[in-house]
Amino acid sequence: MTRVKRGNVSRKRHKKVLNLTKGFRGAASLLFRTANQQNMKALRYSYANRRKKKRNFRRLWITRVNAAIRAYGFNYSEFLYVLKNSNILLNRKILAQLAICDPDTFFKFIMSIQ
C-alpha cells in the first residue's frame, strides 16, 4: 500500500476552522475538534437568527407604534383598521420611525386620519 501524505491539507483545514473561531472562549478557539463543533453550532445559530431578526424588528416596530398611539387614546388594532380603511400604505417601520424621530408629524398624521 502506498503512503498518503495529507499534512498540508489537514493543516490548512484546521487553520481555516481555528481562524473562524477566533474570539470564542476556552477550548472552542484552541482545539480543532471543539472549535469545529462550536463553528458548526455558530453557523446554525447565525442562519436561524437571520430569520429571527426580521420577526424581532417587526415586534419592536409594533411595540413602538402601540406605545405612541396609546398616548393619543388609540388602540393599535383600531389604528391599523383605520389606516387600512383610509388606504394609507405606510408600513410599521415607517410609522415607528415617525413616532420616535418626529412626534409632531406623527401627531398631525394621527389627527388627520381620525
From Swiss-Prot:
Keyword set, alphabetical order: Chloroplast, Plastid, Ribonucleoprotein, Ribosomal protein, RNA-binding, rRNA-binding
PROSITE patterns reported for this sequence: RIBOSOMAL_L20
Disulfide bonds: none
Compartments where located: Plastid, Chloroplast
Pfam families xref list: Ribosomal_L20
Cellular component, GO annotation: chloroplast; ribonucleoprotein complex; ribosome
Annotated protein name in UniProt: Large ribosomal subunit protein bL20c
Chain's gene name: rpl20
